[in-house]
C-alpha cells in the first residue's frame, strides 16, 4: 500500500471519528478515484479544485442577491454601520490570509496533514467548522511569520 493511500485512509478515519463528513467524504472520494484509476480526474482536481471550490463558495455568497433576499438597499445600509465597516475590514484581512495560505500550501504541501488534524481537533474540541485549508494555511503562515520575528 502506497504512503499516500495510508495517509488518505488515516484522514478518512479521523474525519469519521471527528464527525467531519466533509473531510471523510473528500478522503473517501479521492481514495475511490485513485482505486478506479481515474488519474486524469485526480490531476484535474489537484490543479483546479481550489479554484472550483472558491467559485462554488462565491456562488453561494452571491445567490441571495439573485433570489432577492439581499438587495442594494441592504448593501448600502451595511456600509453605513459599524458591523458593515468591520465586515469590509474582515474581508480584506481574510483574503490576505487566504493568499498566504495558498502560498504556504504551494511551497510546503506536506503541511496539509497538520492542518487537517488541527481542523479535526477544532471540530471535536471547540465545535468548529472546517471551511478548508486556505484559512488554516493563512493562519499557519501568519503564526510562522510571527514566530520568525520573535525567534530573531
Swiss-Prot record:
UniProt xrefs under InterPro entries: UPF0756_TM (IPR007382)
Cellular component annotations (GO), alphabetically ordered: plasma membrane
Localization: Cell membrane
Membrane topology annotation: Multi-pass membrane protein
Keyword GTP-binding belongs to the record: no
Statement: the UniProt record of this protein carries the keyword Glycoprotein: no
Transmembrane segments: 6-26, 52-72, 75-95, 111-131, 132-152
Keywords on record: Cell membrane, Membrane, Transmembrane, Transmembrane helix
Record protein name field: UPF0756 membrane protein Helmi_09930
Species per Swiss-Prot/TrEMBL record: Heliobacterium modesticaldum (strain ATCC 51547 / Ice1)
Family: Belongs to the UPF0756 family.
Domain of life: Bacteria
Database matches in Pfam families: DUF441 (PF04284)
Amino acid at each position: 500500500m502506497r504512503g499516500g493511500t495510508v495517509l488518505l485512509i488515516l484522514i478518512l478515519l479521523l474525519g469519521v471519528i471527528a464527525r467531519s463528513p466533509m473531510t471523510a467524504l473528500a478522503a473517501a472520494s479521492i481514495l475511490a478515484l485513485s482505486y478506479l484509476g481515474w488519474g486524469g480526474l485526480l490531476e484535474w482536481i489537484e490543479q483546479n479544485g481550489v479554484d472550483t471550490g472558491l467559485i462554488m463558495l462565491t456562488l453561494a455568497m452571491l445567490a441571495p442577491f439573485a433570489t432577492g433576499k439581499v438587495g442594494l438597499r441592504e448593501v448600502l445600509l451595511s456600509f453605513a454601520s459599524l458591523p458593515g465597516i468591520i465586515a469590509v475590514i474582515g474581508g480584506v484581512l481574510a483574503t490576505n490570509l487566504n493568499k498566504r495560505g495558498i502560498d504556504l500550501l504551494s511551497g510546503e504541501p506536506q503541511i496539509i496533514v497538520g492542518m487537517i488534524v488541527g481542523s479535526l481537533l477544532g471540530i471535536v474540541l471547540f465545535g468548529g467548522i472546517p471551511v478548508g485549508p486556505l484559512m488554516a494555511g493563512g493562519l499557519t503562515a501568519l503564526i510562522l511569520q510571527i514566530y520568525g520575528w520573535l525567534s530573531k
